């Protein structure tokens, strides 16, 4: 089965494959970027206020995604009675790319959701205890849904940026338990966001590394490494995928350096987008 960023050779011609690989060997990329350079990033927050408590549209070059956040009330898990729940899902539609198919979530959609979800969970982006309404009875449940609109590579990073921007701008009604019923207090709350972690994806092509791969670059990659980096430069999650090619420890160190070089600028874009809707 094809995996995200690891499609069959029929998707790209042999000539294109050789051309891209040859450029990389020469230290060049098809769009003229440096190996450690992201495409232009644009973030627009609160794009669907009527349908979500928080939302964001992200354009990463010619890749674009929208993330929407819904906050519901539910019961906590038995092993964490005083903690709320946060979950990331994704719906990959043929509208974004003919590579995506209608129907139940495929392996690539599940993988993408897991990677982005792990970045949120492992960094403890949301203070789970701050989502508790009444211990053991009711908590807030936060669902971040991602919808790719256009796909030209690196859905992971685009989705991560969109989810973080949407979470930062989420406002929802405060609820309380009264006579065993959930009722609104009339107040509005913001999510207890305590740590932002941005995911950075680096592709290995031959013995070279490039950050933020385009779709054509994903077609020829040997593998990729996705790293979640928080605001204190901590690496909170790592995931290798996109192919079975090996990646040495030296290359992993190099990839981590690329991520650290970019995290501050992207975080500033997210924070600026969030301030625009305050």
At which residue positions do the language-model features occur?
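Polyanion-binding surfaces on beta-sheet-dominated domains and ring/shell assemblies
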Residues: 2-278
């Amino acid at each position: 089965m094809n995996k995200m960023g690891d499609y069959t050779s029929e998707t790209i011609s042999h000539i294109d494959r050789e051309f891209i690989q040859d450029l990389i060997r020469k230290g060049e990329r098809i769009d003229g970027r440096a190996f450690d350079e992201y495409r232009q990033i644009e973030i627009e927050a609160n794009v669907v206020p009527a349908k979500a408590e928080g939302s964001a549209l992200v354009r990463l070059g010619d890749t674009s995604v929208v993330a929407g956040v819904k906050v519901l009330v539910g019961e906590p898990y038995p092993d964490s009675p005083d903690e709320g729940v946060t979950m990331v899902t994704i719906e990959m539609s043929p509208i974004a790319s003919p590579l995506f198919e209608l129907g139940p979530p495929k392996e690539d959609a599940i993988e993408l959701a897991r990677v982005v979800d792990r970045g949120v969970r492992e960094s403890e982006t949301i203070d789970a205890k701050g989502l508790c309404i009444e211990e053991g009875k009711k908590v807030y449940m936060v669902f971040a849904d991602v919808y790719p609109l256009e796909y030209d590579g690196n859905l992971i990073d685009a989705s991560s940026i969109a989810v973080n921007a949407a979470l930062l701008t989420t406002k929802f009604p405060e609820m309380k338990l009264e006579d065993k019923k959930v009722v609104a207090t009339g107040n509005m709350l913001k999510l207890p966001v305590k740590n932002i972690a941005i995911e950075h994806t680096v592709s290995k092509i031959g013995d070279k590394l490039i950050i933020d791969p385009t779709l054509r670059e994903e077609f020829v990659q040997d593998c990729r490494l996705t790293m979640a980096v928080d605001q204190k430069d901590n690496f909170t999650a790592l995931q290798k995928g996109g192919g079975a090619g090996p990646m040495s420890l030296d290359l992993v160190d190099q990839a981590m350096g690329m991520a650290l070089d970019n995290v501050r600028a992207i975080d500033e874009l997210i924070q600026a987008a969030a301030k625009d809707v305050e």
